[in-house]
């Protein structure tokens, strides 16, 4: 991952926005931004690897910068944090070193340094769009949800892992037209997760095909940090027999492009 970031630094501003130190090991927090940053243009934040083990979010963010970002030069400012949780990425872990879930900790006084450093990076800027790239994996159900129940002393209730791509919109302002534009683009790349027999995905009622909502700010989710009018969290299913790692990365890229295209079409000039 780091060599790819270094190569991209020829085209984007490489920003070190913090450093984590865990058990004597240091992890630099890196982002890449439009160069120059034009204050007259709208801005989009793209984040990946909030859960470090969700590989396609990291790979998709980097692939977007490598293959598609040039098409948006002069139209939108981009700030991309491709791997918010590098310790988790290296160790294939959902949580950070302190057994904290970063994607429930995005508050200024929260316990996750991955989260607080990203908040400080984003805070000085105004964003029209924030898309946060995630996966739902079999290990969520088989490993991390049982571990969460054990950690918190609560019963573990088995669930179903959705087979396919879906989006988590903000319950307070879901912007369904925006979400549906992303779903339409992604379904050309990979399949969209169907609801279960109760009409739900991960226990939440669908509000449109492939779309559920969470109260992002209440849950301390990454997608809540900017207050942008257009936000979403992508979820790819990499363990599906119907999807390859390349498709998962391509789905993330398609989601980012569709999100940018929708917002730019709505906010010309």
Language-model region placement:
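Structured catalytic-domain cores with a bias toward divalent-metal coordination
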Residues: 1-269
């Amino acid at each position: 991952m780091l060599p790819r970031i270094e190569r991209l630094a020829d085209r984007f501003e490489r920003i070190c926005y913090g450093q984590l130190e865990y058990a004597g090991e240091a992890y630099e927090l890196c982002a890449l931004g439009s160069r120059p940053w034009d204050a007259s243009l709208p801005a989009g934040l793209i984040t990946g690897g909030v859960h470090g083990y969700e590989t396609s979010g990291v790979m998709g963010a980097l692939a977007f910068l490598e293959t598609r970002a040039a098409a948006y030069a002069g139209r939108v400012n981009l700030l991309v944090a491709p791997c918010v949780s590098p310790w988790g990425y290296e160790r294939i872990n959902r949580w950070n070193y302190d057994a904290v879930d970063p994607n429930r900790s995005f508050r200024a006084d929260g316990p996750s340094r991955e989260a607080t450093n990203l908040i400080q990076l984003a805070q000085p800027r105004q964003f029209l769009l924030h898309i946060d790239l995630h996966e739902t994996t079999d290990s969520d159900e088989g490993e991390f949800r049982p571990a969460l129940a054990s950690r918190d002393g609560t019963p573990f209730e088995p669930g179903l892992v959705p087979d396919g791509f879906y989006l988590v919109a903000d319950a307070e302002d879901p912007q369904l037209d925006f979400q549906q534009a992303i779903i339409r683009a992604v379904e050309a790349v990979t399949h969209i997760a169907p609801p279960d027999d109760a009409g739900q995905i991960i226990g939440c009622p669908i509000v449109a095909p492939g779309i559920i909502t969470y109260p992002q700010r209440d849950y301390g989710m990454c997608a809540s940090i900017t207050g942008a009018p257009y936000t979403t969290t992508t979820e790819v299913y990499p363990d599906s027999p119907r999807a390859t790692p390349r498709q998962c990365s391509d789905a993330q890229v398609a989601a980012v492009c569709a999100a940018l295209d929708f917002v730019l079409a709505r906010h010309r000039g």
